[in-house]
């Protein structure tokens, strides 16, 4: 069961992705996707034309399993700048977005009946992915600084998790951000108790005021962390393009996924388009635009709620 947006219990999962626009004058807060005016058709048209102007035939082939090398190099540069920490392109594995990444990780690093620790509450559709793999969900309480480490330690005394799923920055639905100290504690506990940390960092780059603590992607050298990123929130969900940043040994295990061995690089064409968007500076300028626009909208909504 899951909670509907009206707060009532529902036995059916809600569909949260659609193509239709809300009625005039309606702002739909029940769907985690950009408004129509923040879907950059012109930008992507420019990037696509730039790619096709110089495209080589083999660039339309299946592509290497880890993802296009040129795209991964461009993405590594973006993350290095954003994280203020070196990111190696070999640590990046291209995905079709964070939902697919989470599904891959559950299938590759957990077995039916295994425990997965999550923040309580957490992104409600992640529950369905865990259920698809027969995983047992164990909730860990949070406060204003994110997942409570003492509660995690206590739960580790009675449960052995295969995975810990966390949304460290700008949590959905709670809004809190995991402090730097707690991020380090989670990483240390993952090594001590031999579980993998799945950090859903889809909001890490969408800071409107102060920057969040360093991404958990900067800790992947520890060996037990998989950092999930996506262009769904910082460009367009329809691109279905994202990445997993992790250690070399975990990348090797991801390369063993059957669908990767069969089909090669995921969203290979889209990867080329985004590489050109990055190289042209379009991705960086669009991200600045999103931050400023969302900051203004947050301030407008906050002021309206305070008036009420």
Q: What is the predicted role of each segment?
A:
Residues 196, 206, 234-236:
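Short glycine/serine/proline-enriched coil/turn segments at secondary-structure junctions
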Residues 32-36, 99, 123, 169-171, ...:
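Short, solvent-exposed loop/turn segments at secondary-structure junctions
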Residues 221-295, 299:
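Conserved core segment of the aminotransferase class I/II
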Residues 5-97, 278-285, 299-300:
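N-terminal small-domain helix-loop-helix segment of the aminotransferase-like
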Residues 58-193, 204-222, 294:
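Conserved core of the PLP fold type I
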Residues 38, 42, 46, 66-69, ...:
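Alpha-helix N-cap/helix-start motif at coil-to-helix transitions, marked by capping-box chemistry
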